[in-house]
């Protein structure tokens, strides 16, 4: 691209015609922009100029006499800056004829904005460096202000060219050098500007898959949505044939909001997706409704995927595109939100002991209800960006009552190799309401029968806190309860008082409750979820059953709005209770709601008890052995 005159060694002539080909801008050696490109012309050559050593380089003001008044300002302002920036090696050369800059005017105008952006970025990174006289001359004249929509940002910041910044008063996303945004996570949340790619239905319970398969499901969902969304750059360049089992796990895609720039708000309570154009909330997933999240994997560096349940999409994998290396930052923030939520519980367990915040879909088939992570005892997640809200110890199809009270999610901010990994440290903590210390995960099957604290098989029920110990409850039942069916009780339920604390329960209450239930016509004994739903025909139908997978759990199954609801009646302390009241027994609860025509409220939905399904209608039920 440069030619040296063979007839004379006194100077070096630059032929403008050689620069007519603009393809040189794509060569690798010109892709790096350095501060040396705007320094003095003699700085790059220790021995002076390349041409005549005895001559001194002509100053830039000498350009003015050779040019018209209008062109002199433009050339001195634009041409030297663009030329020296794009071709750093030309900084050490002396131009034989300054008038040739007129020929480069058109070429420089095309690259003017790029060079200014890079120079602006370099000056931001080195603010203490004094400007040379040549650089000051390059900026003479009324230089236009850089467009804020095109100024480059650091990798962990928001990309203004893809999504506008949050409005005033909103917390800006943190960078990796900043401290943990605890005040934002505990408050309104931390905002990230990302691109929503859509979601794809997850048909199979994630609980039944090991960690490797769950990662394959996430990556396959990312690949499918990248192929379906126009303009998406696929994370996996070489598309491999999907594994056969993925066809049974992933279902249809929902591209209603795909390709939309959204604001992701991460807090200790939920993940919120908001459209930046019209401030419409696309989705609001409570923390307990999220199965697991992954981000920053080697093959999906620009994407964050999380599986959540909501009434619209049911169980679905939602994909977010995070450019400029923001994916690892987003998944780390989500992990910190999990950790902070657990710490909140440790400080005030009475407020969170039975708190249920998620709104999930009821009535799904029994093998599809609980995609709660790490249900295999002793199984630990591999490294690679997997985090989970629902790590549990029990190898059953039910989740732990409070997802954060029986587990400890460890965040490892100092370990770069595990920056996106959140491991289960549940063996170090002691579950509330269990009178015996846990020796480890090996003894978790002993907890299966008596210490399941979920109020719903399908966890939708909002519950509060326990009141009294089951020891006194079991001791007073024999004298306080009348003989016969407890349906005839007219006693008002006990109201839950705020600030009441839970005391250790007693396993003696469970046989006592089972014996009482055998006297009830609506109690069907051990009955699976699917079998119970087949008996529910009309709205208002209900029955009481004992869980097949978790003996000792007594469930009220009812039909409301065509959907089956499953309410766990007895808490870990042996109390029969709802959100606001504590009842003497199951019959007392049913009679109270039927006589007063009151619904059982469950996370905004209602369950009304109208027609009991009697056990004699279930021909497969055998009489109890006494």
Curated annotation (Swiss-Prot):
Q: For the PID domain, which residue ranges apply? A: 186-369
Provide the leader sequence positions.
none
Domain of life assignment: Eukaryota
CH2: region residues: 1-185
Q: Where in the cell is it found?
A: Postsynaptic cell membrane
What are the protein's UniProt keywords? Cell membrane, Membrane, Phosphoprotein, Postsynaptic cell membrane, SH2 domain, Synapse
Sorted alphabetically, the Gene Ontology BP terms of this entry are:
apoptotic process; intracellular signal transduction; positive regulation of cell population proliferation; regulation of gene expression; stem cell differentiation
The chain residues annotated with the modification Phosphotyrosine are 422
Q: Which Gene3D superfamilies match?
A: Pleckstrin-homology domain (PH domain)/Phosphotyrosine-binding domain (PTB), SH2 domain
Q: Which InterPro entries match?
A: CEP152/SHC-Transforming, PH-like_dom_sf, PID_Shc-like, PTB/PI_dom, SH2, SH2_dom_sf, SHC_SH2
Its PTM note reads: Phosphorylated; the phosphorylation is enhanced by EGF. Phosphorylation at Tyr-422 is required for the interaction with GRB2.
Region listing for CH1, in residue ranges: 370-521
Q: Quaternary structure per UniProt?
A: Interacts (via PID domain) with phosphorylated MUSK (via NPXY motif); undergoes tyrosine phosphorylation downstream of activated MUSK. Interacts with GRB2; the interaction is dependent of Tyr-422 phosphorylation and increased by EGF.
Name of protein: SHC-transforming protein 4
Q: Which organism is it from?
A: Mus musculus
- Gene of origin? Shc4
